[in-house]
Amino acid sequence: METTSIELGGVLIQAPVTSGTNLLLAVQCAVYSARLRTDAEPRPRLWAGFFAMMSLATLAGVLKHGLRDTLPDGAFLGVLWISSVTGGVSTYYAQLATIRSHARDATALLLSRAALVQLVVFLAASVGLGPEMTLLIADTAIGLLPVIWFEARGCPEGGWVAVGLAVSIGTAAVYIARLSVGPWLNHIDIAHALMGVSFLLIARGARAAAPRQEGVPWS
């Protein structure tokens, strides 16, 4: 893949479009997190945690792509760790938001513990293997595919979340196919645009707390 760069204030910024779209995503997620955090209901507050983690992950992406040849090796590794760990924790928050919305107390407790076990396994595997993207993708798929299914069935608001998460996971196809318009709009940039749409949809569905009703999937 052909690399691009610009110089800002004497600092060489590599992949400026990729870094810039990461920054926009970080701001977008931070705004959603701040808005949802003020809600009294647990569902939007947990989705606020999801967006807070995604804001940190995408902010780390600014450094990972923009300063990858400028940062010292130790600092760059730290950025990779932040990006990976926050991505895993964001999946955990998404799981909790769905569990607390659609499951009753005993089931919710059991599923919450299962989600915590998944997070611990992911973190332990990351310590052993390092911040591997393949590991993060696997953890995300295992955690979010059930979330998509239950959000789609649980309440009207959950449909927005389900579609948003499906779009987010669908960006993997863009990465695999390496869909690109050119060096200044590569497959990562296109994936970032789709992620922006994904976050918009998730935020719309997260604003309203889903009631626990008889007959919902996890009752």
PLM regions with names:
Residues 1-54, 62-219:
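Polytopic alpha-helical membrane-helix bundles and their juxtamembrane interface segments
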Residues 59:
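Conserved phosphate-interacting/catalytic interface
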